[in-house]
Regions:
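Short linear motifs embedded in intrinsically disordered, charge-biased segments
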Residues: 1-182
Length: 182
């Protein structure tokens, strides 16, 4: 869901709302103290997180988008464990209890997995047509240019110290971008 200015704010907030809808549908299980926390984490990983990250492969995310997703995730996980922020329990401890990797890392994994699919396709494939490119001789307005998906991928590759040519080898690429659950 692109906005007129090319931003993804509405899409991120919509995905967070969808995650909360899934949460409410399953609140009977997730808020039950008799259900083991490991099982709650597995349910979160299989039902709620995919709903929140649906379509995120194509998002050129900014720090605030990642932060919004992270905040929503931690609120859900804390609630599932029966804790609040007042209990002053660290996020890492909560994540270990329910065995859930940070949504930020999973978001990057999804984006890099999609990048690998694109890299392995021939250059005339339809998937390359949909990529936005900046025109060289077009005058644009003042201010910083909008963040593109390619720039997000470059940043992710640099942060994770992965060479983009590795994407041509499917097995090695899968190992390089894998984010294990704790």
């Amino acid at each position: 869901m692109l906005q007129k200015d090319g931003d993804i704010d509405e899409d991120v907030s919509h995905r967070i709302k969808v995650g909360w809808l899934k949460w409410r549908q399953a609140s009977g299980v997730l808020c039950d103290k008799r259900v083991p926390q490991k099982l709650k984490g597995k349910f979160y990983r299989t039902a709620i997180r995919p709903a929140m990250l649906y379509g995120a492969e194509c998002w050129p995310t900014k720090r605030r988008h990642v932060q919004q997703l992270g905040v929503a995730e931690m609120r859900m996980l804390r609630w599932a464990c029966g804790h609040t922020r007042k209990d002053r329990i660290r996020n890492d401890v909560i994540r270990e209890r329910v065995r859930v990797a940070p949504i930020e890392e999973k978001l990057v994994q999804h984006r890099l997995r999609w990048f690998g699919h694109i890299q392995r396709r021939p250059s005339e494939a339809p998937v390359h047509i949909g990529r936005l490119r900046r025109a060289d001789n077009v005058k644009r307005g003042r201010g910083r240019p909008n963040l593109t998906w390619e720039e997000s991928v470059k940043r992710d590759l640099k942060d994770w110290a992965i060479n983009k040519d590795l994407a041509l080898d499917r097995g090695a690429w899968k190992l390089a971008i894998h984010v294990p659950e704790p």
